[in-house]
């Protein structure tokens, strides 16, 4: 089989690498991909992730068996719809189902309708009304841009000053453009966060091993929200009972509800959850693999990944098995200044010194004219290591991160400490 992955980040690197482990996969192409993927025999195709005609044309020429669409933007722009209309099998929700990620307001109304546990919230398009509601609710409070903002459109405000600033940025300064013309204000939930992703086909839900992401930029969960600074899987302090409850009360009702709404969901449903005193509740839904969670969850998949996706695309029951022992830890190397203002084009040092048994997933990198890797984004790459315990994983992984030390980049040194 020849397969095509759409996207260019660390998530797509992990997806492509896992597909290449499958028995009957010959070639994996990534459009547009990044230069670091080539090191794992992934073939790059110079087509943008939203170029529907280009993707269709290539898929036909290269005799692609199926396409996996990685990021949220092409999903919401209807890339899966276009591929399927052209007779090409594609894994990922169509645009009308991807709305569960594309609009926080839609997701909130949907959860309310289907009694899926989440924080109380209200949606606003008028700044004065939103500000009045903020004054009434007080802090801590959470303010979210309705649309896509690359994981940065959420402010968890502990002080009123911070809340008002976030609201002004979104509604008056239009910090996220059209994405923040509508704003969701929701109650703050206290508890332990975790990510639960599942393979979904209509009403069928096949959960993956859970992961814990680290959203804040700096140690001790301080600083602004990012796309994610590191992750690990599984999460030893979240019990199987809690995960089962989340599948029963959140994922299954969501999958069934989407079918009822005429928004048949086939793809990855990602639930960002928080374990509160009343049980697990939804912080957010995403319509695709999480990044960086994918880089620590997919390596733990024991079943044949390509066969699994192929089964779902043929409405067959997939074989979904994850490793039961050990833990996988991943730490992101980011450009200094991320998630705000950062430079591109800084040379990466020490990459060739990283131990062979440590996985390198490239995200914001490219090669210069001397074939040296330079930065090309906020999150540059992720190193991942599997070990028996978290203490072992941290002891083995962080010396490898230190090989990449460079004033132009930074990483969090506390990823995984909660699981020790």
Swiss-Prot record:
Reaction catalysis annotation: 5-phospho-beta-D-ribosylamine + glycine + ATP = N(1)-(5-phospho-beta-D-ribosyl)glycinamide + ADP + phosphate + H(+)
Membrane-spanning residues: none
Statement: the UniProt record of this protein carries the keyword Translocase: no
SMART domains xrefs: GARS_A, GARS_C
Cofactor names: Mg(2+); Mn(2+)
Any one GO molecular-function label of the UniProt entry: metal ion binding
Cofactor note: Binds 1 Mg(2+) or Mn(2+) ion per subunit.
Cysteine disulfide partners in this protein: none
Superkingdom of the organism of origin: Bacteria
Binding site for Mg(2+): 284, 286
A GO biological process held by the record: 'de novo' IMP biosynthetic process
Record Pfam families: GARS_A, GARS_C, GARS_N
Keywords associated with the record: ATP-binding, Ligase, Magnesium, Manganese, Metal-binding, Nucleotide-binding, Purine biosynthesis
HAMAP family named in the record: GARS
Family listed: Belongs to the GARS family.
Protein name: Phosphoribosylamine--glycine ligase
Organism: Listeria monocytogenes serotype 4b (strain F2365)
